[in-house]
Design a protein with these regions (language model features):
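Conserved small/polar residues in nucleotide/adenosyl-binding loops
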Residues: 143-145
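Short N-terminal targeting/anchoring amphipathic segment
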Residues: 89-104, 108, 118-120
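A short, charged, and often flexible helix/loop element on the N-terminal side
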Residues: 57-86
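Short acidic, glycine/proline-rich loop/turn micro-motifs
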Residues: 14-18, 70-72, 131-136
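Active-site proximal beta-strand in glycosyltransferases
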Residues: 3-4, 112-132, 137
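A short, flexible beta-alpha/helix-coil linker loop
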Residues: 9-14, 65-69, 128-129
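N-terminal subdomain of nucleotide-sugar transferases
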Residues: 1-52
Length: 145
Protein backbone atom coordinates (compact mmCIF):
# COMPACT_ATOMS: atom_id res chain seq x y z
CA UNK A 1 0.00 0.00 0.00
CA UNK A 2 1.19 3.52 -0.77
CA UNK A 3 0.45 5.88 2.12
CA UNK A 4 0.73 9.67 2.13
CA UNK A 5 1.19 11.23 5.58
CA UNK A 6 0.55 14.99 5.68
CA UNK A 7 1.97 17.01 8.56
CA UNK A 8 1.52 20.49 7.13
CA UNK A 9 2.38 22.69 10.10
CA UNK A 10 5.37 20.90 11.63
CA UNK A 11 8.10 18.50 10.59
CA UNK A 12 7.57 15.17 12.34
CA UNK A 13 11.31 14.55 12.17
CA UNK A 14 12.27 17.88 13.76
CA UNK A 15 13.81 18.33 17.20
CA UNK A 16 11.26 17.46 19.87
CA UNK A 17 10.55 20.29 22.29
CA UNK A 18 11.45 23.09 19.88
CA UNK A 19 8.78 25.36 18.42
CA UNK A 20 5.71 23.24 17.54
CA UNK A 21 7.47 19.89 18.01
CA UNK A 22 5.88 17.57 20.53
CA UNK A 23 3.50 14.64 20.75
CA UNK A 24 2.17 14.97 17.21
CA UNK A 25 5.71 14.78 15.85
CA UNK A 26 6.52 11.65 17.84
CA UNK A 27 3.24 10.05 16.77
CA UNK A 28 3.67 10.77 13.04
CA UNK A 29 7.31 9.72 13.14
CA UNK A 30 6.59 6.42 14.89
CA UNK A 31 3.46 5.47 12.96
CA UNK A 32 5.28 6.22 9.69
CA UNK A 33 8.23 4.04 10.70
CA UNK A 34 5.94 1.17 11.71
CA UNK A 35 3.77 1.42 8.60
CA UNK A 36 6.90 1.42 6.42
CA UNK A 37 7.67 -2.13 7.58
CA UNK A 38 4.97 -3.40 5.22
CA UNK A 39 4.02 -0.35 3.11
CA UNK A 40 5.51 2.53 1.15
CA UNK A 41 5.13 5.68 3.24
CA UNK A 42 5.65 9.24 2.08
CA UNK A 43 5.61 11.97 4.73
CA UNK A 44 5.27 15.59 3.60
CA UNK A 45 5.47 18.84 5.56
CA UNK A 46 5.43 22.51 4.62
CA UNK A 47 7.97 23.40 7.31
CA UNK A 48 11.59 23.74 6.17
CA UNK A 49 13.48 20.55 7.00
CA UNK A 50 15.99 18.16 5.48
CA UNK A 51 14.58 15.56 3.09
CA UNK A 52 15.56 11.90 3.38
CA UNK A 53 14.74 8.47 2.00
CA UNK A 54 15.00 5.02 3.55
CA UNK A 55 13.81 1.67 2.22
CA UNK A 56 10.05 2.30 2.37
CA UNK A 57 9.91 5.71 4.06
CA UNK A 58 10.44 8.99 2.22
CA UNK A 59 10.30 12.38 3.91
CA UNK A 60 9.89 15.63 2.00
CA UNK A 61 9.74 19.25 3.05
CA UNK A 62 8.13 21.66 0.62
CA UNK A 63 10.04 24.50 2.35
CA UNK A 64 7.17 26.98 2.64
CA UNK A 65 8.09 28.42 6.04
CA UNK A 66 10.74 28.35 8.74
CA UNK A 67 10.29 26.44 12.01
CA UNK A 68 8.90 28.64 14.75
CA UNK A 69 6.33 30.50 12.65
CA UNK A 70 2.98 30.78 14.47
CA UNK A 71 0.18 28.46 13.37
CA UNK A 72 -1.89 31.48 12.37
CA UNK A 73 0.90 32.64 10.06
CA UNK A 74 1.23 29.15 8.57
CA UNK A 75 -2.42 29.04 7.47
CA UNK A 76 -1.77 31.43 4.57
CA UNK A 77 0.42 28.74 2.96
CA UNK A 78 -2.29 26.04 2.81
CA UNK A 79 -3.29 26.50 -0.83
CA UNK A 80 0.33 26.82 -1.92
CA UNK A 81 1.07 23.57 -0.05
CA UNK A 82 -1.72 21.76 -1.90
CA UNK A 83 -0.49 23.08 -5.25
CA UNK A 84 3.08 21.97 -4.49
CA UNK A 85 1.82 18.52 -3.48
CA UNK A 86 0.10 18.25 -6.86
CA UNK A 87 3.20 19.49 -8.70
CA UNK A 88 5.70 17.25 -6.90
CA UNK A 89 3.80 13.99 -6.38
CA UNK A 90 1.59 11.76 -8.49
CA UNK A 91 -1.19 11.84 -5.92
CA UNK A 92 -3.23 9.23 -7.79
CA UNK A 93 -0.58 6.66 -6.83
CA UNK A 94 -1.46 6.90 -3.14
CA UNK A 95 -3.97 4.42 -1.76
CA UNK A 96 -4.77 6.49 1.32
CA UNK A 97 -3.92 9.84 2.91
CA UNK A 98 -3.44 10.28 6.65
CA UNK A 99 -3.65 13.94 7.69
CA UNK A 100 -2.33 15.16 11.03
CA UNK A 101 -3.76 18.30 12.69
CA UNK A 102 -6.70 20.27 11.35
CA UNK A 103 -4.76 22.26 8.75
CA UNK A 104 -3.51 19.06 7.12
CA UNK A 105 -7.06 17.71 7.27
CA UNK A 106 -8.33 20.58 5.13
CA UNK A 107 -5.77 19.77 2.43
CA UNK A 108 -6.43 16.02 2.61
CA UNK A 109 -10.18 16.58 2.27
CA UNK A 110 -9.69 18.64 -0.91
CA UNK A 111 -7.33 16.07 -2.43
CA UNK A 112 -9.66 13.23 -1.45
CA UNK A 113 -12.61 14.88 -3.18
CA UNK A 114 -10.63 15.76 -6.32
CA UNK A 115 -8.68 12.50 -6.71
CA UNK A 116 -11.10 10.05 -5.07
CA UNK A 117 -8.49 8.91 -2.54
CA UNK A 118 -9.74 7.93 0.93
CA UNK A 119 -8.28 9.85 3.84
CA UNK A 120 -7.95 9.58 7.60
CA UNK A 121 -7.82 12.66 9.77
CA UNK A 122 -6.25 12.70 13.23
CA UNK A 123 -6.82 15.98 15.07
CA UNK A 124 -4.11 15.62 17.75
CA UNK A 125 -5.49 18.78 19.39
CA UNK A 126 -8.76 20.47 20.15
CA UNK A 127 -7.06 23.81 20.79
CA UNK A 128 -8.91 25.58 18.01
CA UNK A 129 -12.22 24.75 19.66
CA UNK A 130 -10.97 25.84 23.06
CA UNK A 131 -10.23 29.28 21.58
CA UNK A 132 -13.90 29.64 20.83
CA UNK A 133 -15.95 29.03 17.73
CA UNK A 134 -14.80 31.15 14.83
CA UNK A 135 -16.86 30.57 11.68
CA UNK A 136 -14.19 32.03 9.40
CA UNK A 137 -11.61 29.61 10.73
CA UNK A 138 -13.55 26.34 11.05
CA UNK A 139 -16.60 24.99 9.26
CA UNK A 140 -18.08 22.63 11.86
CA UNK A 141 -20.35 21.05 9.24
CA UNK A 142 -17.26 19.25 7.91
CA UNK A 143 -16.87 17.33 11.17
CA UNK A 144 -18.66 13.97 11.21
CA UNK A 145 -18.54 11.74 14.27
Amino acid sequence: MNILQISFHTSPFGSIGKFDSGGLNVYVQQISKQLSNENNVTVVTAEKAENFKTDNLDFYSLDLFEPGLSVDDKEIHLQEFKIKLEENFELENFDIIHAHYWLSGLVAKQISEEKNIPYIFTSHSLGIFLEGYNKERVDLSLIHI
